């Protein structure tokens, strides 16, 4: 557990993070968590490194790498940043190596980087295709019925299972750290359920529920 001792929010066009970095230096927290996004916010990571903060206070993020920031920043600016996602392109598994090999064989020099968001979309298509195959039809309600039967498929990110009550997924989660401009996978957490959503949402018991829940996540 832990306590958040301060929180800052920034417009998407902000490029000067000096005041916030100075506040962090004064507060000396155990860790800093960034959810910054967009081109302007890349300045934070550059200024963080320039202020000598790398190695002083760990920096984690729930967004870093999704926009391929680690491929844009220098190693000096990005090495050591920690992120946790359901997929990293650097996963060293047979399924992922096969997927990337086929992707590169098809697109060659035009092969795009594959991040968490891209893989989630790919997984969704694979799950839908498997549900259509099992249902024997593309009829919407028939496919939903199959999807709610805890259907699973195994792809580049690992095994992904639909959690019927939440319509979210049970999936492997990976903890990674940027090293040399790429993510190094430090830990693997198998078949993690959508526990936060499951605490408030059950679409099997309440199939017409359209509530937008405010989920509080304990630190």
Can you describe what each PLM-predicted range is?
Residues 1-219:
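Extracytosolic ligand-binding ectodomains
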